Amino acid sequence: MTSSTGMEAHNPLTSGDFTEVSEPFRLFAEWLAEAGKSEPNDPNAMTLATVDPDGLPDARMVLLKGLDARGFVFFTNTESAKGRELAQTPKAALVFHWKSLRRQVRVRGPVEQVTADEADAYFATRPRLSQIGAWASSQSRPLEGRFALEAAVASATAKYALGTVPRPPHWTGFRVLPVAIEFWHDRPFRLHDRVVFRREGEGADWSRTRLFP
């Protein structure tokens, strides 16, 4: 485990003193920044959990692409399994786990689509081949073989040539509006630090509760 005792001694956001912090978004942003320095790959990776039409849980890894005062933002194909599940049941849970820091964050709440302007702005920042891929991939649908995917990529590449690749209508972002955010920090002998922040809905005040490990 990478030691950060010097920093922890002076920064309540990154030490056991985080249990006294009153603003969870600020605490999360600090932890994410710390993870960016120590995680070997994708510190913004998170498990996204949804439920299917039968009520069975479904989970996969996605990347956090935005964090603001309202919530946690990711982008995807609305025709994918997760897109269809969120359309039917717009609620989700997220889990961030940073092994290098021995920390975990859990998030739960309703989900909304981002605005078209937000989706357009983010799509414009993606590498061109990723933009092409958004058109070429019928995400979560059966694929006959790799050649079929490559043919779809070639077709989309030819279609847009050297021009701007527009955002597909089925590609957008979702924002998880948290009603609960739990922070977990590993401690010796499994005497971990756990704090959960809860609120009744967006804009409501947060309550803070320390939990037994």
From Swiss-Prot:
Q: Does the keyword Oxidoreductase apply?
A: yes
> What are the recorded GO MF terms, alphabetically?
FMN binding; pyridoxamine phosphate oxidase activity
Q: Write out the catalysed reaction.
A: pyridoxamine 5'-phosphate + O2 + H2O = pyridoxal 5'-phosphate + H2O2 + NH4(+); pyridoxine 5'-phosphate + O2 = pyridoxal 5'-phosphate + H2O2
Q: Does the keyword tRNA-binding apply?
A: no
Instruction: Tell me the Gene Ontology biological-process terms attached to this UniProt entry.
Output: pyridoxine biosynthetic process
What's the cofactor? FMN
- Which controlled-vocabulary keywords does the entry list? Flavoprotein, FMN, Oxidoreductase, Pyridoxine biosynthesis
**Note on how the cofactor is bound:** Binds 1 FMN per subunit.
Q: Which residues bind FMN?
A: 60-65, 75-76, 82, 104, 139-140, 184, 194
Question: What disulfide bonds does the UniProt entry report for this chain?
Answer: none
State the PROSITE patterns in the record: PYRIDOX_OXIDASE (PS01064)
Under which EC number(s) is this enzyme classified?
1.4.3.5
Instruction: Identify the pathway.
Output: Cofactor metabolism; pyridoxal 5'-phosphate salvage; pyridoxal 5'-phosphate from pyridoxamine 5'-phosphate: step 1/1; Cofactor metabolism; pyridoxal 5'-phosphate salvage; pyridoxal 5'-phosphate from pyridoxine 5'-phosphate: step 1/1
Q: For binding substrate, which residues are annotated in this chain's numbering?
A: 65, 122, 126, 130, 190-192
Record-linked Pfam families: PNP_phzG_C, PNPOx_N
PANTHER family (alphabetical) = PYRIDOXINE-5'-PHOSPHATE OXIDASE, PYRIDOXINE-5-PHOSPHATE OXIDASE
Report the sequence similarity comment from the record. Answer: Belongs to the pyridoxamine 5'-phosphate oxidase family.
HAMAP family assigned to the protein according to its UniProt record, in alphabetical order:
PdxH
Record's subunit section: Homodimer.
Give the function comment from the record. Catalyzes the oxidation of either pyridoxine 5'-phosphate (PNP) or pyridoxamine 5'-phosphate (PMP) into pyridoxal 5'-phosphate (PLP).
| Protein name from the UniProt record | Pyridoxine/pyridoxamine 5'-phosphate oxidase
Tell me what organism the protein belongs to: Xanthobacter autotrophicus (strain ATCC BAA-1158 / Py2)
